[in-house]
């Protein structure tokens, strides 16, 4: 088979950037990414392991758990690959040639980076629909989502393939100089099918769902607050706060996609990173901060610890 593309030029690291400033950027970035990823891990462990029986009937937490998996992957690959090699210039001449010669690792990183971001968009659509259904049809909400939860989880995993298929079939991935380090790019098998185009489509679609569903949810929370359980109400407000972080990510993506004169702006590039970082780690921080249920389960009070200790002591006394 003949490939109709020209090889990009070999990597030449840009030495005009200050190593100390770029490394400081990296340290500042991981100072919030890694704690946010750890918080996602705690929440995921609580939902799936330590309090599995408590959460297994919750459709919202099932969707949030899958969203947390995407967030953890994003934090891991960005902290220890993407941002590391982008913002630490001394690594560029050492590591860059290796990734230039082998395109498998850059391809895996690039694919995971795009797939998980699209997955988070789809998961967010499912979460705002879940909360809207809760306030619109509180009586039938449980029945509806018992049928929809598994379907939603499959869709969250599969639907991003609609935006990553060209990455899978693309013949060449390579590194290019950026911010003193290097970033990943690729030769598109289908020239028009860029990853940024698909990300814009997914994000803007999620933006429409977010605006409509969140508006309806907020209106119903205000008008029918006495008919909604306090636990469900707390989740609704948590999701509204998460939606605000998504709106910031969507706005920066839309500006980057449709403002051609803005694409070369370092400020917008940084703002886009920060906005999606806020959406990635912010969901865990917001759920922990605004939801007393999840906060109490991750950080139980001394009274709860004493109660668990007494139960364990009683159980042990019966087994001896």
From Swiss-Prot:
The UniProt record lists the keyword Transmembrane helix: yes
Annotated transmembrane regions: 29-49, 57-77, 85-105, 151-171, 197-217, 240-260, 268-288
Subcellular location: Membrane
Gene Ontology cellular component list: membrane
Any GO molecular function: transmembrane signaling receptor activity
Entry-linked Pfam families: Srg
Biological process per Gene Ontology, one example term: sensory perception of chemical stimulus
Main location: membrane
Record's bilayer topology term: Multi-pass membrane protein
Keywords (A to Z) from UniProt: Membrane, Transmembrane, Transmembrane helix
Family: Belongs to the nematode receptor-like protein srg family.
Protein name as catalogued: Serpentine receptor class gamma-15
Organism: Caenorhabditis elegans
Gene, per the UniProt record: srg-15
